[in-house]
């Protein structure tokens, strides 16, 4: 998956982006059992509610960035863990990437997604040097875009398929639930708090 959870002892040091150790884990296991960290149960979360959850988690991200000064969001808590800004850049790019993958799944038969190296992108695009205000704007726009596209899905479209570059197969249903774990999990990464993922009146996750 695109998700990474980089835990390490806290430090005030600001270190080069290439200190991050690439994450080679396959995060498709989140479709089988609840995440022990962020507690999202993607296996049982309704795909039809992903659109709304995307907007709520985007609001949580905007609040995190708005509440912290620029020097704080740029500071890594440890050499091998992204800063809040770097995580936000990653989430913004996940919204963009998965929106394009969703478009492919809805318009083409069994597409294979182009590969994406999240760690290489973080270095090449200089996540740590980006403008937090622009990241906020782009993250909000990306969330609105993919939420709107998920909101159009209905009926048999949930069963349409697509393939990751490593051959892993998704339906639009499993793709939606796999995807939404990423921004939810990264809220936990940067705040240590687990956000409610069900709407008011529904059972909390």
What are the residue ranges of the model-derived segments?
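Active-site rim elements
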Residues: 44-48, 131-136, 176
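Acidic/histidine-rich alpha-helical segments that form the ligand environment
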Residues: 53-66, 121-160
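A short small-residue
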Residues: 35-41, 119-127
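Short, contiguous alpha-helical
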Residues: 2-32, 72-122, 144, 159-205
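Aromatic-acidic/polar surface patches that form glycan- and anion
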Residues: 50, 54, 80, 139, ...
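Secretory/endomembrane lumenal or extracellular ectodomains immediately following the signal peptide
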Residues: 23, 28-44, 53
């Amino acid at each position: 998956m695109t998700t990474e959870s980089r835990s390490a002892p806290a430090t005030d040091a600001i270190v080069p982006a290439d200190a991050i150790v690439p994450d080679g884990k396959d995060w498709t296991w989140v479709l089988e059992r609840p995440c022990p960290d962020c507690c999202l149960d993607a296996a049982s979360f309704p795909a039809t509610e992903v659109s709304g959850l995307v907007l709520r988690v985007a609001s949580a991200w905007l609040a995190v960035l708005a509440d912290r000064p620029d020097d704080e969001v740029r500071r890594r808590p440890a050499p091998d863990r992204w800063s809040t800004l770097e995580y936000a850049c990653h989430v913004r790019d996940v919204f963009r990437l998965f929106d394009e993958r969703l478009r492919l799944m809805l318009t083409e038969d069994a597409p294979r997604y182009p590969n994406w190296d999240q760690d290489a992108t973080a270095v090449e695009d200089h996540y740590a040097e980006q403008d937090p205000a622009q990241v906020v704007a782009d993250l909000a726009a990306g969330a609105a875009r993919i939420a709107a596209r998920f909101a159009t899905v209905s009926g048999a479209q949930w069963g349409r398929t697509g393939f990751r570059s490593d051959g892993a197969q998704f339906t639009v249903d499993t793709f939606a639930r796999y995807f939404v774990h990423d921004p939810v999990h990264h809220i936990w990464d940067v705040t240590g708090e687990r956000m409610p993922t069900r709407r008011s009146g529904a059972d909390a996750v």
